[in-house]
Amino acid sequence: MASPTDRPKLRKLDRSVLNRGDEVLVVLRDPFGIAQPAAFPQEATHVLDMLDGQRTTAQVRQSLLLRGAVNLSLEDVQGLVAELSDAGFLDDDRFRSLWDTARREFMNNDVRAPRLAGVLYPEDPTALANTLNRAVPEPHDRRFAGSELIGVLSSYQPFEGRAAALLSATLQELPRPQDIDLIVMLGTDHHPGRLPFAITDKGYGTPLGDLRPEPELVAALERRLPWIRREELRHREAISLEMGAVLLHHIYGAECPPVLPVLCGQAALLTGEDEAMTDAFLATMEHVLEGRRVFWWISAELSHAGPAFGRPPLAADGVRALAERDLACIESLVAGRPEQFVARCMEADEALGKPSGAAALSTMARLLPIGYRTELIDYVTVKAVGPDAGWVGLVGMRFFQPAVIDDDE
C-alpha cells in the first residue's frame, strides 16, 4: 500500500464515463496500451485530479476534506493509489517495468502483431475474409491497368454499416501491384508522442498474412533523421495502420508491394520553430522516394466528438456543427491548400477538438505531388464504437496524378 509520504503522479490517460445501471464509473484507458482499461467509482475522480506528483497521499486527503469534495480516509486514498500503481496508471517504477517488458517484446519481433483481431474485426482468417468480402467485395476486380490513382483516404472503423459502404465506394480502380514499388501508409497516431512521426521496419501482421516492410528504406530515413524511430513503440497500438494493413492484404494478398508505415502525431501540426522536424521529414521523404512508383494509403478520420473521446456531450445541433467543420476542412484538402487545412483544424473548439486525422491529412497534402487531383467520394457521420456516446466524421477520397498539360495546345 502507498505510504503517506509518497507523491504519486497519474500518467496522461484517456478518461470516459460509463453508466452501468444506477452506478456511474470513470474508465481509464492507456493510450500506449501498456496498462489494461480499468473502471473506478466516479468519486475517484476527485483523487485522480490531485495526483500531480507534488502532493503526498496525506496532503491529497487533507485537500479533499478542506474542499468538501469527498470524505475518504487516508487508507482509502492509499488503497486507490496502490490500485492505480498495480494497474500501471502511475508514473512510477511499476509502470516503467511494464513499459520495458512491452518494449522488449515489441522490438524483438520482426512483425508487428495485430492487436485488434477479435476486438474490431474477426481473428479467424476465414471469418475475417468473409467480413471483408461483404464490406469490400471482389477485391481482385478493383485493380485497374493504367490507373492514374496515386492514393486513397480511408477510415479505420469496423468493416460494417456506413463505414464499409464508404470503403467500398472509395477503393475502386486501384493500381495493380506490379505497377507499385512502395505503399506509404500514413496513419493517425492517438498516442501523446513528443515527435511528429514514427516509422518502423517491422512487417505489419494481420490474420490473413503479413505485409512486407522495406528495411533498406527505413535505414536510409534513419541515417538522415536519427530521431525517426525513437518512438517506434507507438506502432504497437496503431489502430489506424492495423486496419489499413488488413484492407491492403484483402485487396492485394500475397502480391502486396512492400509498405512503409508512418504514424503522424499531433506534433506534426506545430508551426514556427517547432516545425523544423516536420520540414526535415518532408524534405527527406521527397529525396528517398524520388523515382519510385509510390501509392499513398492514408488511414485517417475527421472529428471525434463526445464522451467516447473524452470530450463534452454534443449539443442538440452538435452533429450538424461537426459536419460543417469537417466539410470546411475537406474543402481545403480538395483545393490542395495544406496550410489552410491546418489553420482550420487548429481553430479552438472545446466540444469538437481538433479533427482526429489532422496530422496525417496535412502530411499527405504536403507529400503528394504539386497539382494533385482529388475526388471526394462521400462524407458521413457514424456513432462511436463502444458504450459511450460519440460521433465520428468519415470521409472517402481518391487522389490522382496532376493533369498533364499539352504544350502544343
Where are each of the predicted segments found?
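Short beta-strand element of the conserved SAM-dependent methyltransferase core
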Residues: 28, 397-400
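Short proline/glycine-enriched turn/loop segments at secondary-structure junctions
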Residues: 381-390
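Active-site histidine-anchored catalytic micro-motif
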Residues: 110-371, 379-382, 402-409
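Short hydrophobic/aromatic beta-strand or adjacent loop that forms the aromatic wall/cage
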Residues: 390-396
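Acidic, low-complexity/disordered tracts enriched in E/D and polar residues
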Residues: 1-49
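Short, surface-exposed linear segments at secondary-structure transitions and domain or protein termini
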Residues: 45-50, 386-387, 405
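Long, charge-rich, low-complexity alpha-helical segments
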Residues: 32-122, 126
